[in-house]
């Protein structure tokens, strides 16, 4: 009999992400554990979900676990390859018309010290207002 109690916190997080994705749901996915969780959902939990990533790839069906949202292995198995501007427009339009079908998972690396998503600002040694 298999021991299903021997798992890491990261494995449980990826599984929890996969289990929270519903059939036919559009899933905006960030790098890291969200990408692993969405890949697991697409392959094992609900194959009809539609993962999309900020690099413009939609309805991705990865054969291997991609390292990032721009991984070429990820690009080879997706339904649509859009420029980023179309991705943002699609996301906004979908939220306005059918918000129940849209869910997003982002990783901790995508959140700055002020709680903003990295599209707001990521800075190193500089000032927050002038990174």
Model regions: which residues?
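N-terminal active-site beta-alpha-beta segment that forms phosphate/nucleotide-binding
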Residues: 1-82
